[in-house]
């Protein structure tokens, strides 16, 4: 796949307005899902669109370094001075094993594509592999250090700097609140999982149990699902997925922690986290009809968790924070339209 082909691919797939359900604005995220026109395409371009495992999902694992660099170059939402902000596709890890395609592995090619050949980019802030959204890069170590100090100080003061949006299977009750739960990492079948610790001892804390805290606010509801705003106040792997599962409302596309939520006679409950293995998320038939998905597509459903907003320090010590926004990915906008999730 050449560079021209990748750029055309990006224009077809990585657009915030791409969708396939009713034309209607989503819940306040500044994107719109439209039924795309069907221009004549070559068979290769047609295959790129039609063989996607989930509608509107960009599969970065099928790209090479140069191709991914072009995709990320097209995903840049802001570039000022040493700072580069881009909208990361879902499924792209920040780090990984040697030879694995990651955000770090593509930074040299991305720097060249941005005209920064002699300036080394480093990651300042980024969502995890399964989430999409804002990635903050810097070519200046001093700027990166200043930003890291700002984020650390904000966490200590419990001032959220990151705002995610998520679609949940189920509607959290109450509609807003705070989830506070100690978590630890535990390996199960060679998979590292975040596990709640109800009453951690001093020994637990010494062995790595961390207090985690997140705020949530339901922005819209529809078809038994919710569009939820999430603001983590601590940093822990998979914190938001675990917190939503604890609310009995797992995030759509969470094929790791959704299995902890069981249902008996229409009532939801939590399975023991220590003995519940990750498995593909199971959705009821009515929800599948609303989403217009085939069984094979459901198995490939991406995590509907998007880092939508970041606050950065102002230029002066007394200046208010500045704001960065990233539009929703196409599959996320499509889901909002199919579930009729509009701002209430």
Curated annotation (Swiss-Prot):
Presequence extent in this chain: 1-36
Subcellular location: Mitochondrion matrix
The reaction(s) this protein catalyses: a uridine in mRNA = a pseudouridine in mRNA
EC number(s) on file: 5.4.99.-
Disordered as annotated region, ranges: 25-53
Keywords, in A-Z order: Isomerase, Mitochondrion, mRNA processing, Transit peptide
GO MF terms, alphabetically ordered: pseudouridine synthase activity; RNA binding
GO cellular component: mitochondrial matrix; ribonucleoprotein granule
Enzyme class: isomerase
Family matches, as InterPro entries: PsdUridine_synth_cat_dom_sf, PsdUridine_synth_RsuA/RluA, RluA_PseudoU_synthase
Gene3D superfamilies associated with the record: Pseudouridine synthase
Pfam families: PseudoU_synth_2 (PF00849)
Gene Ontology BP terms: mRNA processing; mRNA pseudouridine synthesis; positive regulation of mitochondrial translation
SUPFAM superfamilies attached to this UniProt entry: Pseudouridine synthase
Subunit annotation: Forms a regulatory protein-RNA complex, consisting of RCC1L, NGRN, RPUSD3, RPUSD4, TRUB2, FASTKD2 and 16S mt-rRNA.
Family: Belongs to the pseudouridine synthase RluA family.
Function: Catalyzes uridine to pseudouridine isomerization (pseudouridylation) of specific mitochondrial mRNAs (mt-mRNAs), a post-transcriptional modification necessary for their translation. Acts at position 390 in COXI mt-mRNA and at position 697-699 in mitochondrial COXIII mt-mRNA. As a component of a functional protein-RNA module, consisting of RCC1L, NGRN, RPUSD3, RPUSD4, TRUB2, FASTKD2 and 16S mitochondrial ribosomal RNA (16S mt-rRNA), controls 16S mt-rRNA abundance and may play a role in mitochondrial ribosome biogenesis.
Listed PANTHER family: MITOCHONDRIAL MRNA PSEUDOURIDINE SYNTHASE RPUSD3, MITOCHONDRIAL RNA PSEUDOURIDINE SYNTHASE
Protein name per the record: Mitochondrial mRNA pseudouridine synthase Rpusd3
